[in-house]
Structures are given as structure tokens and as C-alpha cells.
Amino acid sequence: DRLAELWRRLRRKDVFPLTLWSGIKALLLGRDHLIEPTRLRRIVRNTLHHARFEDLPLPLHVVATNVLSGQAVVLSEGDVETALLASTAIPVVFPAVQLDGRYLVDGGVSTNTPIASAVELGAQRIIVLPTGMSCAMLEPPRNMAALALHVMGLQSMRQLDRDVAHYSSQVHITVVPPLCPLSASVFDFSQTAALIYRAAKQTYEWLGSGGLDSSGPLHVPLAHHHYRR
């Protein structure tokens, strides 16, 4: 409930304060990113209160990407805030985060659903909660940040399919069905409450029908689109 309430309060400007001036400024100054993560950092800090991995009640591992090597980097100790900012540093949108001599960006660049990392850490059963994709969108996003997010969403669905196919013989993998059809852009925060309601209702029904215990075929949300003529 606390997490849902946090999401309901968020507006796009709280996370992506993108304006015409910020885009022009990035070009004039030759920056490699459009937005400073100041507001995102404030949200994380006010929510986590300077939490450290070592003090958490449950083990947590955050995956980022080394921007120079392209390899996934699993962060499991130290400051959670820095790890999350690194893991969500969408290339071009946010700057890379420097940590222990490495430049880190969004984990989705190397592995959006880090099944491989979970297997390497010893997981025997993996439950994937995919964010889904805007499969009913009628036209592509018109600004750079929204387009970057949309493309990464497409990539994550493809990679999820490959990862499940590769690792399902080694560990038990369950993919919770995402919302479909979905027309909202990942850059659109105006529909958050409605999406939370739909997702909760659908997931409760899925759990009630034995979704977690089902031995049937895995539900993998492949990249797709609902075409309208």
C-alpha cells in the first residue's frame, strides 16, 4: 500500500523534469544526458532514508550496467540510494553514476529482467514481474526521453523471452502476466492509479486460479502490438 501510494503521488515532472530549455542546454553544453537526477534522488532518499544493503531485513541485489564493458554489475553492499540511481540511469536521459571506478547506467541495457544474475546468486525459484509494454499505442513517442524508455521496454520483452527459454530447464521460473492491451506510454504518469487498480485485480485473479503453482506453459509477454486498421 505504501508503494502504491508513492506511485499515485508521482507526476512526470517529479521524475522527468524535461523542458525545451533542458534539451537546448544539454546540446549547448555538450552534455551526454538530458536531465539531472536531482528530483529522482530526492524521491529515493526520502523513501529509503539512507538505507544500506547490509541493514535490510531481506537480501537485495540491484543490477546496473558497466557503460564501458556492457557487462551487468550486481550491487549488493553499501548505499542503496546510489545503487538504485545507477540502475535507473537511462542512457541519454540521465547521467551515468560513477561507483568504485566504474561508470554505471540502467541495468536494462545489459539485462532488463536479470534472471541470469538471480541464477548465479543461487536462486532456485524465480518470479518475474514484468512492467509490460505499450502494446496498444497508436503512434511512437514524440520526445527523446519517452522514445528511449519505449525502446528499452521493447528490448526487455525480447530478452525476457530469451532468458526464460534459456534458464527454465535449470530453475523454476514464473512470469506474472502484465497488463494487455496497454496504451499508456511509460512516460505518462496520469494513468497511474487506474493501471495499479487493473494490475492488482488481474494479478489477484491470476493468483486465485493457481498462477504461481501452475505447471502449464510459461506466460511470456513477447513484444507485440495490437494493430488497428
Show which residues each predicted segment covers.
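Patatin-like phospholipase
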Residues: D1-R229
